[in-house]
Amino acid sequence: MNRCWALFLSLCCYLRLVSAEGDPIPEELYEMLSDHSIRSFDDLQRLLHGASVDEDGAELDLNLTRSHSGDELESLSRGRRSLGSPTVAEPAMIAECKTRTEVFEISRRLIDRTNANFLVWPPCVEVQRCSGCCNNRNVQCRPTQVQLRPVQVRKIEIVRKKPTFKKATVTLEDHLACKCETVVAARPVTRTPGSSQDLRAAKTPQTRVTIRTVRVRRPPKGKHRKFKHTHDKKALKETLGA
């Protein structure tokens, strides 16, 4: 019993010394030590062990909170730096006029235009083509050296519900060299009065369309039955005058 009281007094003195030198001791620990439930060294160890576990957990939670808040602030600062800082953006480089690898689709028209009931394998291949931009809109990136390359593909047909494989040859076009060349644009034709085309049109004789009116002659009227047999015109006039 005396040993427990000695340990208790020494612990109180140690706590006072620690509180004077460093962080303050929690009041809960003094309340637990002042309780008469401590009857043995094991009770004191259990009490201190439980208190140390609680303190370690609180310290761990505090450290985690500090670390998470620090990480969040650091990530937030990085995000602001990447979005708002102009030093992150790299200078833009022009896409030079040169040969680049492109994907070329092998269509069925290149193999057989009369039949469409087959498949081509492989469906696409890689070719070298000129691409890029030039310094002026009046020039374009065009190939200056071209090479034709024949390749062999498979033509797969379904005959009587069974696949048949045939070989076919397709000629591919590869660009070996490129250059920015001037594009000759078609100039719009502006006609001015007195131009050569107008003079030619003036010299060309114009055909006049003349409309003729054709009079349709009516058939002669027949003689009356009374004067049908009178052939002498003079006698006929005298008869009519009478």
Swiss-Prot record:
Region (Disordered), start-end ranges: 219-242
Pfam families the UniProt entry points to: PDGF, PDGF_N
GO annotation, cellular component aspect: basolateral plasma membrane; cell surface; cytoplasm; extracellular region
Keyword terms of this UniProt record: Cleavage on pair of basic residues, Developmental protein, Disulfide bond, Glycoprotein, Growth factor, Mitogen, Proto-oncogene, Secreted, Signal
Classification via InterPro entries: Cystine-knot_cytokine, PD_growth_factor_CS, PDGF/VEGF_dom, PDGF_N
Keyword Disulfide bond: yes
Disulphide linkage map: 97-141, 130-178, 134-180
Biased composition (Basic and acidic residues): 233-242
SUPFAM superfamilies named among the record's database cross-references: Cystine-knot cytokines
Signal peptide residue numbers: 1-20
Residues of this chain annotated as glycosylated in UniProt: 63
Bias type Basic residues, positions: 219-232
Record function comment: Growth factor that plays an essential role in the regulation of embryonic development, cell proliferation, cell migration, survival and chemotaxis. Potent mitogen for cells of mesenchymal origin. Required for normal proliferation and recruitment of pericytes and vascular smooth muscle cells in the central nervous system, skin, lung, heart and placenta. Required for normal blood vessel development, and for normal development of kidney glomeruli. Plays an important role in wound healing. Signaling is modulated by the formation of heterodimers with PDGFA.
Subunit description: Antiparallel homodimer; disulfide-linked. Antiparallel heterodimer with PDGFA; disulfide-linked. The PDGFB homodimer interacts with PDGFRA and PDGFRB homodimers, and with heterodimers formed by PDGFRA and PDGFRB. The heterodimer composed of PDGFA and PDGFB interacts with PDGFRB homodimers, and with heterodimers formed by PDGFRA and PDGFRB. Interacts with XLKD1. Interacts with LRP1. Interacts with SORL1 (via the N-terminal ectodomain). Interacts with CD82; this interaction inhibits PDGFB-mediated signaling pathway.
Name assigned to this protein: Platelet-derived growth factor subunit B
Taxonomic lineage from the root: Eukaryota, Metazoa, Chordata, Craniata, Vertebrata
